[in-house]
Amino acid sequence: MEIGAYSFGDTPLNPDGSPRSTAEGIRNLFDAIVAADRAGLDYFGIGEHHTVSMPASSPGALIAAAAAATSQIILGSAASIISTDDPVRVFQQLATADAISGGGRVEITAGRGSSVETFPLFGYDLADYDRLYAEKLDLLMTINESPTETVSWSGTVRPTLDELAVVPRPVAGRLPIWLATGGNAASSARAGKLGLPVSYGIIGGEPHRFAPLTELYRRSAAQAGYTENIKVSVATFGLVAPTKQEALDRFYPGWHNLNVEMGRLRGWGAPDRRQYLAQSHAPGAYYVGDPDDVAERIVHLHGYLGHMRHFLQGDLGGLPHEHLLESLTLLATEVKPRVARLLAAK
């Protein structure tokens, strides 16, 4: 089981709650990735967002910078919003990062965007949501599977490629491409039919209820003739601290801030601390606790989903940077070995 973290960037807050510099948020994210590598985490994902509170707008640039400053950790986009980006550029940026890393440490997770701020930003129509994603995912896979630098492709959402060079190629020839989903059955079936590993973003509810989706994914893959590379990963909110109470107290303010912001955008009701506490204990979706608590809950979920990677987002809503760094260290040095021991004993 790989243990990791992910982030959309987290702009720090002043004491009065006003945001500091988004550039500071990016520097903090870079420092966190380097710290995660040194601590021994397996994976760090950078999710594309374009808001003042979540400023990680260029995963490829951050991954390339981190690739030069790290030596072991797997780096990936979590996710790249390919519906509103050019898959040629996404591939080139991540292949460049792969070359900088020495090869074998860079992945792409392709998403279509549950947060839709990229559509007005880049001039796309939400009415084309499904068509954009389907065609651009096909283009990304076509580029990745090409045996040479030369690629041909045609579709309706982008100009045709007619034996054009797409460079650089990844060190090993291809990059791992994951399909991101928040729990859509059609996306699970699509990932299986395409033979792609699937990454579930679970931000609420009871994660074990995703078991039918993982079964659908594996069944779809088998029916399509795919047996290799059929993998499941899970991304959840989570923060690790020396004690459960410390973790709960540290994570709550950022969670509250995020839900106030999302409530304004999406018409949600006011965040409720009782809901937060319920989600932060089994069988809820927030992996907020001490190392024993978090490890045990990851292993419990593994019994339902059989996932090979679990990664946590802790920095949201202005979480103090030192709390994130401590969480990353505890994930690597305390949670990861506990998970390994618990799985070995099953």
Task: Report each predicted region and the residues it spans.
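N-terminal beta1-alpha1-beta2 module of alpha/beta enzyme domains
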Residues: 1-70, 74, 175
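Flexible, glycine-rich active-site loops centered on histidine and acidic residues
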Residues: 2-22, 84-152, 197-199, 206
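Active-site mouth loops of central-metabolism enzymes
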Residues: 12-26, 80-88, 173-183, 282-291
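An alpha-helical appendage that flanks or caps ligand/catalytic pockets
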Residues: 5, 128-166, 208-308, 340-346
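Hydrophobic faces of well-ordered beta-strands that scaffold small-molecule active sites
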Residues: 3-5, 44-46, 75-77, 106-110, ...
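Acidic (Asp/Glu)-rich catalytic clusters
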Residues: 37-38, 63-72, 94, 98-105, ...
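Conserved, mostly hydrophobic/aromatic
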Residues: 3, 40, 48, 66, ...
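Glycine-rich, proline-tolerant flexible connector loops at the mouths of alpha/beta enzymes
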Residues: 43-63, 81, 204-205, 313-323
